[in-house]
Amino acid sequence: VVAVMITSDKAYDNVEWIWGYRETDRLGGKDPYSASKGMAELAIRTFVESYFSHSDSNVRVGITRAGNVIGGGDWAVDRIVPDCMRAWSKSEVVDIRSPMATRPWQHVLEPLSGYLALGAMLASNEQLHGDAYNFGPPAHQNHPVKELIDEMAKYWDHVKWNDVSESEEHLHEAGLLKLNCDKALFDLNWMPTLQFKETIRMTVEWYKRYYQANDSSMYDFTIAQIEEYTRLALSREMNWAIK
């Protein structure tokens, strides 16, 4: 039995240093959301050590922490991409809390490819049992929120947004967050497929199709995006795609 457990880059106790967090760095958080991810990691570790570390256990567990995931189908409130898509589809202004905050943006298909690669390798390699892995973009593809907005705006007309970082009271929000994904590259031979601009293009194209097609053909369009992603991975000789 293989189980891939998924938390988030928010699981790390973020002190906003300039280098990416490694899997051995301290977990925690200064806000309830981040702290909840740290607590999930503790719960996972407890079960691994208590129930699945005996020699006769047939369960292998992998732990994953993904960078900021974007992509079609996300409708959560107070998330930068869905908020922009909803507002811009109605020619409305969207409020941006932290335009200069930097995040490890990645398309949702990127960590999914990592989860599947980890699960497949866990089945044949018991040495990976109980290990944690970061899945995110390379360091040079961490971008501020404003750059994300500017890139998304290229695909919309009449884009409007308002910087409320100085005028709005809100909960603690980190200004800088990076992940170090060297371990996934070394152990799993995994690396992201898409460049930043490709990530934004695929994301915005999904939402534009949704609003234009009134949800009638999103299944087929979503499958087409998965196939496009897989073709790109093959053409770029990503190890998980070749296997």
Regions found by a protein language model. Give the residues of each.
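Catalytic helix-loop patch of NAD(P)-dependent Rossmann-fold dehydrogenases
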Residues: V1-V2, K10-V69, D74-A76
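Short, glycine/charged-enriched secondary-structure capping and boundary segments
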Residues: W17-Y21, A76-I80, P111-L112, L148-D150
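Structural element of the ATP-grasp superfamily
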Residues: I44-F47, C84, A184
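C-terminal substrate-binding subdomain of Rossmann-fold SDR/epimerase-dehydratase oxidoreductases
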Residues: W88-K243
